[in-house]
Amino acid sequence: MMGSRRSRRVSWASGGNLCKVRLFLSEDSPSQAGLRPQDNLQAKGSWLLHAAGPSSDDSLPPGFESLPPSNDLKIDMSQIPLIRWKCPPHIVLEQDWHIVAGEESREIEIQNERINGALEAIYPRPSNIPPNPFLSLDVKDAHYDDSKTLLVPLIPLEDDDASDQLEGPTLDLPSHYNITGVSNTPVSAEQQPPCGGAISSGFTIEPQAAVSATVTAIMQTIQSNQNGSMADQNGSTIDQELLFKILSDPSQLQRLMKECGPVRHEQSASSSVVAPLVSIPPPQITASSPAPFSDHVGTFHGMNPTLPPPPPMMNRPPSTIPSVAMNHPPSSSPAMNFGSALPSSSPSVNFGSVPGRGVGYYKTLIHQHGGERLEQPFEQHGMQFGMYRQPGPPQNGGIDAMNGAAAMVSRDGKVRPMKPCAYFNSPKGCRNGASCTFLHDASAPTRKDHQKQKGSKRIKLDNTMGGRN
């Protein structure tokens, strides 16, 4: 097979006859033929050069012979008409065409108002010119009061009522009210003094004296506030600064004890803890103090207003602070005293040199009695939701559940509407919780139960109708 193949060889002409030939149509552009304009001209020039040489036609293939030269390609430049160049005329603007400064425009009025509104000052010499003429020197000395700045409320209207109910209501007492205090330590029958005996002058009763003076000062301050001293803004709140000054001044404390009158007691056969009653013509006060000492607990039946006040004692820490609860029981119900029954005779108690309390004790006492106690959400809304607390054993001295309920009702300043909450028992739930202004009734049927009832009725009707058919 190798011998049957024919070998192909390329032979070149001699060096003198070797030339480069490019073939393309005259209608085709150099870009379409794959040539640039310079290559096109060079190809044409080389082709004409070889065509003009001797024996050029013999070396060219048939059809590529050179054309006879013609003189028609010569152009006479003198026969071509020429146009003389003329410079264009210069643009000359007339005087009437000049644009004015804008007297008829609207911006000129705004600019004139801006110029007239700017303050002008004339300075006789350059040294009198301030660094910044637009900034007054009085601005540095001026002090702005931030209290005059109005506060923009950020709480929505629907959340405002809930926030008001969470806060403790202001202390608003009518003409007849009772202040009942219950001691944290129950008094047994063995620790009570004899019925007919009198307490000696050397026996000191520090908690009772401090509580009596404090309750008396509180009542005096409340009466002064109700008479109009603070009726403009906080007519029902207690001025703690004034109360602190009264308790710190022995002369003022003695004067208040004289004005309020003696202390008397009322007893009840069904009570378990003794609570002395401080009487004032308009109100009734029932107060007692805890027993901070385990060896003796004394009860007092009267008070001698002629004795001097106890001197202040700074080196002794304050004892336990009694609590005072505000309630409004009916006027026909008697004062409830907790403790064993005592005879009606009330022997007088003569106070000797009773050591006083320190400044820290009075501050703590004012803070304890002057502040408003916040009710728990269950205590605030338990009466309305129908959730009544069962009476249990007394803790920390004990207090009657009825008195607690009365205090809870008296502290509830706003009456809740009986309209049920639309979000309660729903999949999303009420976001206000116990502070919601609407009624949360757990016994009401939910939306799912209502839908189930409707669905069951429809199924029952469909079954009956299918059976008939």
UniProtKB/Swiss-Prot annotation:
Position of the signal peptide: none
Coiled coil (residue ranges): none
Membrane-traversing stretches: none
Keywords: DNA-binding, Metal-binding, Zinc, Zinc-finger
Source taxon at top rank: Eukaryota
Classification via InterPro entries: Znf_CCCH, Znf_CCCH_sf
Keyword Zinc-finger part of the UniProt annotation: yes
Zn finger (C3H1-type) location: 415-443
An example molecular function term from Gene Ontology annotations: zinc ion binding
Region described as Disordered: 444-469
Compositionally skewed regions (Basic residues) per UniProt: 449-458
Name of the protein described by the UniProt record: Zinc finger CCCH domain-containing protein 30
Biological source species: Oryza sativa subsp. japonica (Rice)
